[in-house]
């Protein structure tokens, strides 16, 4: 099975530490510094949104240039191959892939930037607020998604940075251990006076 990071909304305080850690570690590696996870907020909870590294990943299936592949028990994106078509972001069921525009493009001489006063008058279009439709002349859009910090032997930076342990890396072995522990809790449910295993505190889990 693929590895992935799971988020626990009940423990998340929305401090943005995970986003900062993700951005910093990728910038250090010379990759897009846009965070590989997002923070979704409602009136009651704050939850990190992270790539699930799906077994039958739709993003992998739609990429026209094979920039997305399955390797090392994860779904990985090769930024150097990405053409910025954004199909992967459109089909992701979790909204875990975003578009970043921080890599300059070497434009042909005839397309070099002109001063604003030299441009022909024309109808102005209001800038879009939709992240997938935004663009900037002279900058190439590149998709960014969680790579589980595969360049770090210690694993994802977001998991290690979270002060509340709201993020955890799930592997095949750890999933098996958790399943066995939850089976044990379920079996002892009646013996414990009917206490719901899902109501256990973080320490008890």
From Swiss-Prot:
Species name: Escherichia coli (strain K12)
Function: Probable electron transfer protein for hydrogenase 4.
Binding locations of [4Fe-4S] cluster 1: 12, 15, 18, 162
CDD domains per record: HycB_like
Xref: SUPFAM superfamilies: 4Fe-4S ferredoxins
Cofactor note: Binds 4 [4Fe-4S] clusters.
Binding locations of [4Fe-4S] cluster 4: 63, 82, 85, 88
Binding-site residues, [4Fe-4S] cluster 2: 22, 146, 149, 158
Binding, [4Fe-4S] cluster 3: 51, 54, 59, 92
Entry keyword Metal-binding: yes
Enzyme Commission identifier(s): 1.-.-.-
DNA repair in keyword set: no
A Pfam family of this chain: Fer4_4
Name under which the protein is recorded: Hydrogenase-4 component A
Stretches assigned to the 4Fe-4S ferredoxin-type domain: 2-31, 41-72, 73-102, 140-172
Species classification: Bacteria, Pseudomonadati, Pseudomonadota, Gammaproteobacteria, Enterobacterales
UniProt keyword list: 4Fe-4S, Electron transport, Iron, Iron-sulfur, Metal-binding, Oxidoreductase, Repeat, Transport
Induction: Most efficiently induced by formate during post-exponential growth at low external pH (pH 6.5) in the absence of respiratory electron acceptors O(2+), NO(3-) or trimethylamine-N-oxide, i.e. under anaerobic control. Transcription is activated by FhlA and HyfR, inhibited by HycA, part of the sigma-54 (rpoN) regulon. Subject to catabolite repression. First member of a 10 gene operon (hyfABCDEFGHIJ); it is not clear if the 2 following genes (hydR-focB) are also in the operon.
A GO term for molecular function: metal ion binding
Cofactor(s) needed by this chain: [4Fe-4S] cluster
């Amino acid at each position: 099975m693929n590895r992935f990071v799971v988020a626990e909304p009940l423990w998340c305080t929305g401090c943005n530490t995970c986003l900062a850690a993700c951005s910093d570690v990728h910038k250090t590696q010379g990759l897009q510094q846009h965070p590989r996870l997002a923070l979704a907020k409602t009136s009651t909870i704050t939850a990190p949104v992270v790539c699930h590294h799906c077994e039958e990943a739709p993003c992998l299936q739609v990429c026209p240039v094979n920039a997305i592949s399955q390797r090392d028990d994860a779904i990985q994106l090769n930024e150097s191959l990405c053409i910025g078509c954004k199909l992967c972001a459109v089909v992701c069921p979790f909204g875990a892939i975003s578009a970043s525009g921080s890599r300059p493009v070497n434009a042909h001489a005839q397309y070099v930037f002109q001063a604003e006063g030299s441009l022909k008058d024309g109808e102005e279009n209001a800038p879009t607020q939709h992240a997938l439709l935004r663009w900037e002349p002279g900058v190439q859009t590149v998709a960014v998604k969680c790579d589980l910090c595969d360049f770090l032997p210690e694993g994802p930076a977001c998991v290690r940075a979270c002060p509340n342990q709201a993020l955890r890396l799930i592997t095949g072995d750890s999933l098996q251990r958790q399943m066995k522990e939850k089976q044990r809790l379920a079996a002892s449910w009646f013996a414990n006076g009917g206490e719901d295993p899902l109501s256990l505190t973080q320490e008890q889990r």
